[in-house]
Regions:
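Transmembrane and membrane-interface helices of multi-pass
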Residues: 26, 113-125, 139
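Transmembrane-helix motifs of polytopic, lipid-linked glycan transferases
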Residues: 23, 91-116
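Conserved small/polar residues in nucleotide/adenosyl-binding loops
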Residues: 193-195
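Short acidic/glycine- and proline-prone juxtamembrane loop motifs at membrane-interface regions
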Residues: 130-136
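Helix-to-loop transition at the C-terminal end of transmembrane segments
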Residues: 27-45
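Membrane-interface alpha helices of multi-pass inner-membrane proteins
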Residues: 124-126, 143-144, 156-181
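Start-transfer (signal-anchor) and selected internal transmembrane alpha helices
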Residues: 1-29, 109-112
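Short hydrophobic/aromatic helix or loop-helix immediately within or flanking a transmembrane segment
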Residues: 46-49, 61-91, 95
C-alpha cells in the first residue's frame, strides 16, 4: 500500500488528479469569494476603471498608483458597462487565478502530490485567488514564464510574451522580468563566447 501511494504521489504524470484538483480549487475559491467583502484597494481599482478615461488609465494614473495599467484596463469593460461591482471583480480575479493554477497543474514538472497541494496554500488560494488584486494576473504571467522557460531559445516569442505580460501588470513584474532578461541575455552571450 505504501509503495503504491509513493509511486502515485511522486509520479510526474498529468491526468485526472490535476483536473479534480482544478475543479476543487475553483469551487473553493468561488465559495470563499462569495463571503469576501472587497477591501479598499480592490474598490479603488474598480473606481479607477469605472471613472478614469483610457488616456488617464494609460498615461496619468500609473504615476501615482505605482504599477502599470493592465489591471485597470482589464476591469474597464466590466466597470464601464455597469456590471455588478463585487461579482465582476471576483469573476475576473477567479478567471485569471484559475488559468494560473491550470498552468501550474498541467505544465509544472513537480510530483503529483506537490502539484495537487500547491493550489491550496494561503497565497495561491486566498491572497491571490479571493482578494481581487493584480497579483492574480501576475501569478499567471510567472507560471507562463516558467512553463515557457525550457523552450525559450527555440520558441522565444512565447517567453518574451510572458515577460512582457509580467511587466504590464505590476511593478514587481518589471523587476522580475528584468532579472530574467538579464539572465537570459547572459546565457546567450556566454553561449556565443563559448562557440567562438
Amino acid at each position: 500500500m505504501k509503495e503504491k501511494f509513493k509511486s502515485w504521489a511522486f509520479s510526474k504524470e498529468h491526468g485526472k488528479c490535476d483536473v479534480i484538483t482544478l475543479i476543487i480549487y475553483l469551487l473553493g475559491v468561488c465559495t470563499v469569494s462569495f463571503f469576501h467583502e472587497p477591501w479598499f484597494d480592490e474598490a479603488q481599482s474598480w473606481a479607477i476603471a469605472r471613472s478614469g478615461t483610457i488616456k488617464e488609465i494609460l498615461f496619468e494614473i500609473p504615476h501615482y498608483e505605482g504599477h502599470p495599467p493592465l489591471w485597470h484596463l482589464i476591469l474597464v469593460p466590466f466597470a464601464k458597462l455597469g456590471a455588478p461591482y463585487e461579482l465582476s471583480l471576483a469573476v475576473v480575479n477567479i478567471f485569471f487565478m484559475t488559468l494560473a493554477v491550470a498552468v501550474l497543474l498541467f505544465k509544472s514538472p513537480f510530483p503529483k502530490l506537490i502539484r495537487c497541494l500547491l493550489p491550496f496554500n494561503f497565497f495561491l488560494f486566498y491572497q491571490y485567488g479571493v482578494i481581487s488584486r493584480p497579483y492574480s494576473v501576475l501569478t499567471l504571467s510567472f507560471f507562463l514564464a516558467a512553463a515557457f522557460y525550457p523552450s525559450r531559445n527555440k520558441k522565444p516569442l512565447r517567453y518574451v510574451f510572458s515577460l512582457a505580460f509580467m511587466c504590464m501588470i505590476h511593478s514587481f513584474g518589471i523587476i522580475f522580468a528584468g532579472g530574467l532578461c538579464v539572465v537570459w541575455l547572459s546565457e546567450i552571450i556566454l553561449s556565443l563566447i563559448h562557440i567562438s
